[in-house]
Amino acid sequence: MKVKTLLLGACSALALAGIASAETLTIATVNNGDMIRMQGLTSEFTAKNPDIQVEWVTLEENVLRERVTTDIATKGGQYDVMTIGTYEVPIWAKQGWLLPLDNLGADYDVDDLLPAIRSGLTGDDDKLYAAPFYGESSMVMYRKDLMEKAGLTMPDAPTWEFINDAARKMTDRAAGINGICLRGKAGWGENMAFLTATSNAFGARWFDENWKPQFDQPEWKNTLDMYVKLMNDAGPQGASSNGFNENLALFQQGKCGMWIDATVAASFVTNPKDSTVADKVGFALAPDTGLGKRGNWLWAWNLAVPAGSQKADAAQKFIAWATSKDY
């Protein structure tokens, strides 16, 4: 009996020692649906890597940007893996703020990454500094039943003129239906992401060839006038508080006739477990104004290792798992 007790004690001590010696990765991410799914699958990773534990810091998009930017610029070292956008990667890599992902494993197929996305994550030294968790563009998502009720047919490639007309005709305030839901929450990754893409369709740009700001040009005025009038006439109340997640919830609840936003939303608006209108959703290209330019973007949410992390090998193991083909 004493021998058995001693053996059990030894086993318990070894187990506790194993837990104590495990590295804990602190991962900062955005509170988007796909990242929530990733967190739910964490046990799959830790089962294969029992020497690594994972601690999540999940933040609203604007807060995430502020926190990770402050941390990496000050070399705070709070996070071992950061979720960052395509915009930040080349800039931060050039500053020496990110570690190159040169230890993703022999099985990791870098050539499987879409060239347009991969090039945005590659530094001047041709090394990969972040791996895409997912890439996206933007598109029109709409209620087919409400479009039909309004006596309209959504073109595969709509114009902003059509979108404006359809949004107003689909609006039914008494029934709680907004003709269109668009980002209004302040933030360069919220309303400014949408407005910048939209302005492209109107021929606007931020700077000219001499880096002179162009915000006082008529193309920007046309963009903003259209946006404000459309949101007042056909948008939801409190639109200035709505970003991606808020508009997603409104669309899933059947309160939006149309929504122009990230293509990644398709799986959420068509999932009957989450969406009350899952079987009524159609898709179309982002709108244009006849200039041959559409209001769509190229974006990716990526996983990167800050230079201040002391757990780079474990961090790259996690990134390799989360961005692999098997995942």
Task: Show where each model-derived region lies.
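Short, polar/charged alpha-helical segment
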Residues: 32-53, 141
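Extracytoplasmic/periplasmic substrate-recognition and gating elements
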Residues: 47-48, 146-150, 225, 229-234, ...
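Extracytoplasmic "Venus flytrap"
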Residues: 25-40, 57-61, 136, 189
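Short, well-ordered beta-strand elements
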Residues: 23-32, 52-57, 80-81, 129, ...
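Glycine-centered hinge/linker elements that transmit conformational signals in sensory
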Residues: 166-169, 209-241, 282, 286
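Extracytoplasmic/periplasmic solute-binding protein
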Residues: 127-133, 138, 162-212, 256
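Extracytoplasmic "Venus flytrap"/periplasmic binding protein-like
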Residues: 43-116, 149-151, 250, 254-258, ...
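Hinge/lid segment of periplasmic solute-binding proteins
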Residues: 85-137, 161-162, 178, 191, ...
